[in-house]
Design a protein with these regions (language model features):
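N-terminal periplasmic "start-of-domain" segments of outer-membrane beta-barrel proteins
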Residues: 2-28, 34, 86-91, 141
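Surface-exposed loop and edge beta-strand positions of immunoglobulin-like domains
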Residues: 23-26, 67, 100
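Surface-exposed beta-strand-turn/loop segments characteristic
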Residues: 35-41, 45-61, 69, 81-210
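Conserved catalytic motifs of the protein kinase core domain
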Residues: 73
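Short aromatic-centered micro-motifs
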Residues: 76
């Protein structure tokens, strides 16, 4: 369990851990890690919007903001190890780990330490810790192909990915790849963005008729 070397349930002790397992991930139909992040109960204020008008330099990237304390206050681990931060910065200038760099098909589960853990991990874990556990022991081959369509407009997500793994001696070798092709959707196709006027510059520049 994240934050402890002692075996026990996810609710043992004063710092409970929320776990999103592989079965839940598949039930969500998640195409990116951002889709999983939205289901973390204490996530608040992360910049996971694919809209270029609202996301700025973080378009296509994913991050976690536990309890709304800032991206730099949430520690992101991959298999219990720290990861490098993204080249882009958030709208407030803070740095973060791009979790969308992890293929969904390679993810075993997500462990979220929902309370501050600065005493264990340092000041960058003031809000908590998110640990992405990969399918390191996977053997065989798995391929996924899916298509999702938005309720509004004509936007579609086409996803393809694979994972292969083999065991050689005492070592496991796993290779995973995932690609998401998301078609654009104009603001005019969404009713709340197209009320009483129209604009090609996004909702911020909506023009109202006289």
């Amino acid at each position: 369990v994240t934050g402890s070397y002692i075996k026990g349930s996810a609710t043992d002790g004063s710092s409970p851990v929320q776990i999103i397992g592989r079965e839940t991930i598949e039930d969500l139909g998640a195409t990116t890690i951002a889709d999983i992040t939205r289901n973390i109960s204490v996530n608040n204020g992360s910049e996971n919007n694919p809209d270029s008008f609202q996301s700025g330099s973080t378009q296509g990237l994913s991050n976690v903001n536990l309890r709304g304390l800032g991206l730099s206050s949430t520690l992101v681990l991959v298999d219990g190890k720290r990861n490098t931060v993204a080249a882009a910065t958030a709208n407030d200038g803070s740095v973060f780990v791009d979790t969308n760099s992890i293929p969904v098909i390679a993810l075993e589960r997500v462990e979220v330490l929902t309370e501050g853990a600065a005493s264990v991990y340092g000041s960058d874990a003031v809000a908590g810790v998110v640990n992405y556990i990969l399918r390191r022991d996977f053997t065989g081959a798995e391929v996924v192909v899916s298509q999702q369509e938005a309720d509004l407009g004509s936007q579609t997500d086409n996803r393809a990915g694979f994972i292969v793994g083999t065991e050689i001696g005492n070592n496991n070798f796993v290779l995973a790849y995932s690609k998401l092709d998301r078609s654009p959707i104009p603001g005019t196709a969404i009713s709340q963005y197209n009320q009483f006027g129209s604009s090609g510059f996004g909702n911020s520049f909506l023009v109202f008729p006289p």
